[in-house]
Every structure is written in structure tokens, then in C-alpha cells.
From Swiss-Prot:
Residues 197-210 have a biased composition (Polar residues). Residues 13-45 form the LisH domain. Residues 172-212 are annotated as: Disordered. This is Uncharacterized LisH domain-containing protein ECU04_1490. InterPro entries: LisH, WD40/YVTN_repeat-like_dom_sf, WD40_repeat_dom_sf. PROSITE patterns: LISH. It holds the Pfam family LisH. It comes from Encephalitozoon cuniculi (strain GB-M1) (Microsporidian parasite). SUPFAM superfamilies: WD40 repeat-like. Coiled coil: none annotated. It comes from the Eukaryota.
Length: 511
């Protein structure tokens, strides 16, 4: 069989797809057929490019399609999802053909080239992981409204159903931005900068010239702002170890050195509930809010996680819900979204339901120090050299986004904040840089207030006030937590110090 049977010499995409077929034959243990195909397709000179990560995505989709068409799978969700993939492929094809027909230069390649040739999917050097978006799903619990619509189920009552059961209502570009999807296209993770990466201060110092104290992709204005204290309260006379804010319920949770957690009403500054933590010292808390309760997952510097529920019926009521056991090494990082994910020092990452039921685990490579959920199965991982995107479901790395050792990654309402020793970087929900704040003190944590970065170091906070880098002393003892919150209908931040003192600060604008 000739070379032309499998590919066209002038199109790199055929090499990538042929490589996929070859990989599939090997995985199915058809070594003889794989060898013949490899030779006849002329893959001996094939050199993988940046598009290679798509092969894993293609293989997963191809495997599912094959299972459905061969009758090995009769699962209704699989059938519907495959139909959804096919429909999205066809719709994208027609949409780009239509755009190219109306304005051949609109695709970014100019001229009067055939619109199909203009579609980036046909260029191997383009990020072929665009196809990953076509294979994605949306989190069914992330929003009460249906993210996908299946015309066959138009008469079905009730709120949203799983994304696997239908098709997108809009093109992903026009989907609501307030809800993180269960799958995000890796194309959306790319920084638009020339190098594709944001460098940490340790790397920036080795370059000529000094970076500005404050960078903004959105641009700055002439306004000058500051912070004004509006409330002070002390939830406990003991040392505050960590805290977490439930913004929707206006509740502050403070873990103290006497091994208790206290729930404080941010509108009144009064304690509403306190619970003992079974003689376990809580050192970190992450939460998930619902209409009538707050799920609190607590790190205790051990190989276990403590699960606490805060029911919201009239007032907050804290109670211990259980302990998550199973790790054989100490847990170094954990995250909460629609599930709980925990990573131990041995590289084992486990997934749990919000009720504490174990679901699965993966063995990860490298010394990962921090994890942060981008969506239910997409994560940002940070090790000693970089920050990168990882797909937990497929167990593959997607791409690197930042260089340097991050001290922490915080998921916020408007995206993510990555903290380095002297730098805080705000990334939006598509993992693209929005603002960078550089300070000359060691940063402990950072947050946003009305679109402005505020970084905490020791007793002080740093921010760009519109004209210069400003520094304000918030507490007499070290700041242990700094979070954005909207109290009294004003952009605010809440700070907690080691002494147990908590303060709410509002943003004011002046000359």
C-alpha cells in the first residue's frame, strides 16, 4: 500500500493523525499491523512538535467512539457525548468555513486562501489541543442552569443535567465566565506574552534592567486609592493559626491554637459557633459554599484531613463531619471544588466526594508542593521550578505557565493568585496574566480588592495606589490570612493576625 494512502506530504496534520493510529495499534497490541502501518505511512522521519499532546486527547476520544460504534458500550451518556463531539466538530467546521468565505483575512492568515486551509486546526504548528475543548464537559453542580441543551430532552423538567447528555447552548467564547467548567481548553491556559510564561523574581533579577513595581495588562488609571479600617474583632484570645472566608454567607472561620474553629458573622463581628477539632491542630482550611451549608476541609499537618460542616439555618452552626484517612505519607496540599483532592509527600493524589467517600487515586511524578483546582479535573501544580497545568482525569501534563518556585496558589472569585517570594501574580479564569505586583519584602499571601492586588508581608500590606507602591501596617503581629470580601456593599479585605485580631478594611478612592 502506498505512502499516499495515509497522508499528504504537504500537511503536517496527517503525520499527527497517522501517529495517533500507530499509537492506537500499539496500545491494542497489534504489533504486526503497527509496524506495517509505520513503514507505509512514512513515519520514520516524523518529528513531534508542539501539537503532540493532542494525541492523548485524540486517543481518548477515538477509544470512546470505537467502543460505542463496536457495541462494547451502550451507556446512554457515552452515546450522547459522542454525538455531541461529532456535532461540535461539524458546527466548528461550518462556522470557520462561513467566516473564511465572508472575510478570508479574518482567520489571521490573510489573502484569499481556501477557508479550510485558514482554520488553525489544519496547521501542525498551531496548538492542536484546541480539539480538547471539543471533548470537554461542564461541571453539573457548578451552576443551577443547564450548560448544555439537548433538543431530544426539550420537554424534560427540572434544572440542569450533565453536560454529557447534550450540546452547548453557545460557542465556548460566549459562555458565562462566572462558572469554571469541568474541562477547559488548554489553548485558554496560554499567556499571550511573547515567551508564553511569566517569570518569577528569582529569574527576573538575572535579566538586564529592573521590572516595574506594578504591571497591568489592563492598564492603570489616574485614580489613587487606600485602605480604611471599618471593623475590628477578636474571635478568640488564643493565637490565630489560619482562617477562611465564606463570602456568600458573610462568615469568617478562624482556627486557633487551642484546637478550635470559630465561625464569626462579618456583618456584626460576633461569634456564632465554636467547635473543638478532636485534639487536632488545624493549620489550613479550604471551603465550598452551598445555600444552606459550608463544607470546610481542614489540613492538620498529618496524613489525614478533617471534614467540618457549618450549617446555615438562622445562624452558623459548626460540627465535625468526619476524618479523611488513606494517605500513608503526610499531606502537602489539598483542594476543594465539587470534590476534595489531596496530595501527599509520596506523590499520591486522592479524590474524595464532599461527604468524605474515597473515589480514586493517581501516582504523580515530581516533587509537587501545591495544587489548585482550575476546574473539577484540571489543576495547577507547583513544584520547585515551575507552575503548570495538569489533567487529573487523563493523568497528563498539559503545559507550563509560570517559572520559579511558587509559595502558594489561591483560587479566588476572579481567577487565581500565584504567590512567589517577592511577587504576586493575578491570573484570570483562563489562566492568563492580568496583573503583577512586585514588592521588596517576603510575601505571605495576597488577595484582590476591586480588581487591585494587595500582598501581605509580616504586619504590612502592599498595593499600587494608582501613583506609587503603597505600604500600610495592618497589625502589630504577623498577618496569617488576607482575603477579599464584599461587606456593607463595598469592596473590602479582611486580615487576621497571629494575636487573634481580625480587621475589615474598605477601599476608598481619593486624590
Amino acid at each position: 500500500m502506498g505512502d499516499h494512502t495515509y497522508k499528504k506530504k504537504d500537511s503536517g496534520i496527517y503525520d499527527a493523525l497517522n501517529m495517533l493510529v500507530y499509537d492506537y495499534l500499539l496500545k491494542m497490541k497489534y504489533e504486526g499491523s503497527a509496524k506495517i502501518f509505520f513503514n507505509e505511512a512514512g513515519l520514520e522521519n516524523f518529528k513531534p512538535g508542539e501539537g503532540m499532546p493532542i494525541l492523548a486527547q485524540w486517543y481518548a476520544a477515538f477509544h470512546d467512539i470505537s467502543a460505542v460504534r463496536s457495541g462494547l458500550s451502550s451507556n446512554l451518556q457515552d452515546l450522547n457525548r459522542i454525538e455531541g463531539i461529532m456535532m461540535k466538530l461539524e458546527n466548528e467546521k461550518r462556522r470557520y468555513q462561513h467566516i473564511g468565505r465572508i472575510d478570508p483575512g479574518a482567520m489571521g492568515y490573510g489573502g484569499t486562501v481556501d477557508p479550510y486551509k485558514q482554520y488553525p486546526m489544519y496547521y501542525q504548528q498551531f496548538d492542536q489541543r484546541k480539539m480538547y475543548e471539543m471533548y470537554g464537559q461542564m461541571s453539573p453542580t457548578a451552576d443551577a442552569t443547564p450548560r448544555f441543551y439537548d433538543p431530544r430532552k426539550g420537554s424534560m423538567p427540572g434544572p440542569g443535567y450533565r453536560a454529557a447528555q447534550g450540546y452547548p447552548r453557545y460557542h465556548p467564547r460566549f459562555e458565562e465566565q462566572g462558572v469554571p467548567p469541568a474541562k477547559m481548553a488548554p489553548k485558554q491556559f496560554r499567556d499571550e506574552g511573547r515567551s508564553g510564561n511569566v517569570e518569577s523574581p528569582s529569574i527576573a533579577t538575572n535579566q538586564e534592567g529592573s521590572s516595574p513595581l506594578f504591571e497591568s495588562v489592563l492598564g492603570g488609571g489616574d485614580r489613587q486609592f487606600g485602605l480604611k479600617e471599618v471593623m475590628l474583632f477578636v474571635p478568640s484570645e488564643h493565637t490565630a493559626v489560619c482562617s477562611a472566608v465564606a463570602g456568600e454567607h458573610k462568615i469568617l472561620l478562624v482556627a486557633s491554637s487551642n484546637k478550635t474553629i470559630t465561625a464569626v458573622n462579618l456583618l456584626s463581628g460576633k461569634n456564632e459557633s465554636t467547635v473543638e477539632t478532636d485534639e487536632k491542630q488545624v493549620v489550613e482550611m479550604k471551603i465550598r459554599e452551598y445555600e444552606d451549608e459550608i463544607i470546610v476541609v481542614c489540613g492538620i499537618a498529618d496524613n489525614e484531613l478533617l471534614l467540618v460542616r457549618c450549617t446555615m439555618k438562622g445562624s452558623a452552626n459548626l460540627e465535625i463531619a468526619g476524618i479523611l484517612r488513606g494517605h500513608t505519607a503526610s499531606i502537602v496540599s489539598f483542594e476543594v471544588l465539587d470534590s476534595i483532592h489531596s496530595l501527599d509527600s509520596g506523590g499520591i493524589m486522592r479524590k474524595w466526594t464532599l461527604n468524605g467517600v474515597f473515589e480514586r487515586e493517581e501516582v504523580l511524578s515530581g516533587e509537587i508542593l501545591h495544587i489548585c483546582c482550575i476546574s473539577e479535573d484540571n489543576f495547577m501544580f507547583a513544584d520547585r521550578q515551575r507552575v503548570y497545568v495538569y489533567d487529573f482525569e487523563l493523568n497528563i501534563e498539559m503545559m507550563e505557565i509560570l517559572k520559579g518556585q511558587a509559595l502558594g496558589i489561591k483560587r479566588i472569585k476572579d481567577g487565581f493568585i500565584v504567590v512567589f517570594r517577592n511577587q504576586a501574580i493575578w491570573l484570570d479564569k483562563r489562566i492568563q496574566k492580568v496583573k503583577v505586583l512586585n514588592v521588596n519584602e517576603s510575601i505571605r499571601t495576597a488577595t484582590l480588592i476591586d480588581g487591585d492586588l494587595v500582598a501581605a508581608s509580616s504586619q504590612n500590606v502592599w498595593f499600587d495606589n494608582g501613583k506609587s507602591l503603597a505600604k500600610i501596617k495592618l497589625h502589630e503581629t504577623g498577618i496569617v490570612a488576607l482575603d477579599g470580601v464584599n461587606v456593607f456593599r463595598k469592596p473590602s479585605v479582611i486580615s487576621c493576625s497571629a494575636s487573634g485580631e481580625c480587621k475589615i478594611w474598605i477601599k476608598y478612592v481619593g486624590d
